């Protein structure tokens, strides 16, 4: 059952810092109207179904890379792709990963926002530069890449993490990596197990858009009028269509 959120909403008159997660920034990018309804008025989109298999892959990859983190050696995949780095060992690693409770945070003074995000992994190269890593899982025939329009959200996700770590005083490489697990669909039988091909995809991030976007978010939230919907927003299209039918038939 959907409920209106009464807490953690933006109040233009409040002087308390307001938390904005990486996922909410992405929601703003998808549709300013949905974002405003969510963060200002407490009306969220219906929740999507959890991708439990993807979560399982994330957990197992983290465990696997943690073995090499403890040994301070590169993972075999890093060697295969010629990546001169090792998984970063840091006392805050688990905190940075925990997007629900804390994650990595930064207070953005111009907006009075606290920006938060939970990273999958961080590697470090011999120069001490951090490399942001994100785990992804899919099951498709053909080459896995990050070239589809809908995968722009993956790229923005990477760039926000890079920005957050820089704002926390770390030297961060513009190069990040997606560790992509692709479920095999060409096996003769399931046999109670799902096998994956795992590859690493390099991505050159550019976080120049973030400061401007945060200012736009602040301006939108501070206004008393609901912004226009993104014309491609399926949630708003459904809402508007349902409303027009109800008014017509009512």
Region locations from a protein language model:
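Short catalytic/ligand-binding loop motif for oxyanion handling, primarily in non-cytosolic enzymes
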Residues: 36-37, 44-46, 140-143, 184-188, ...
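Metal-dependent nuclease catalytic regions and adjoining charged, substrate-binding loops involved
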Residues: 1, 10-14, 19-20, 164-250
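Metal-dependent nuclease catalytic cores that hydrolyze phosphodiester bonds in DNA/RNA
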Residues: 1-129
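Short, polar/flexible loop-turn hinges at active-site or ligand-entry regions and domain interfaces
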Residues: 47-49, 143-149, 224
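Residue-level detector of secondary-structure boundary/capping sites
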Residues: 55-56, 152, 201, 227
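Mg2+/Mn2+-dependent nuclease catalytic core
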Residues: 98-212
């Amino acid at each position: 059952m959907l409920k209106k959120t009464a807490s953690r909403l933006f109040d233009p008159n409040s002087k308390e810092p307001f938390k904005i997660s990486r996922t909410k920034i992405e929601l703003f990018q998808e549709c300013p109207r949905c974002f405003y309804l969510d963060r200002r008025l407490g009306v969220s989109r219906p929740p999507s179904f959890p991708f439990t298999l993807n979560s399982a892959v994330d957990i197992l990859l983290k465990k696997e890379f943690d073995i090499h983190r403890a040994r301070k050696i590169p993972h075999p995949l890093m060697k295969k792709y010629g990546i001169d780095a090792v998984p970063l060992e840091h006392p805050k690693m688990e905190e940075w990963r925990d997007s629900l409770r804390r994650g990595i945070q930064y207070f953005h003074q111009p907006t009075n926002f606290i920006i938060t995000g939970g990273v999958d992994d961080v590697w470090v190269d011999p120069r001490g530069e951090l490399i942001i890593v994100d785990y992804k899982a899919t099951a498709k025939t053909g080459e896995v890449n990050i070239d589809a329009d809908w995968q722009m959200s993956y790229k923005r996700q990477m760039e926000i993490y890079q920005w957050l770590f820089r704002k926390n005083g770390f030297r961060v490489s513009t190069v990040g990596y997606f560790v992509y697990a692709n479920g095999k669909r060409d096996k003769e039988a399931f046999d109670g197990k799902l096998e994956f091909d795992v590859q690493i995809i390099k991505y050159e991030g550019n976080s120049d858009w973030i400061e401007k976007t945060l200012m736009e978010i602040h301006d939108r939230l501070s206004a008393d009028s609901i912004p226009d919907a993104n014309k491609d927003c399926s949630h708003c299209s459904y809402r508007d269509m349902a409303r027009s039918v109800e008014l017509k038939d009512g």
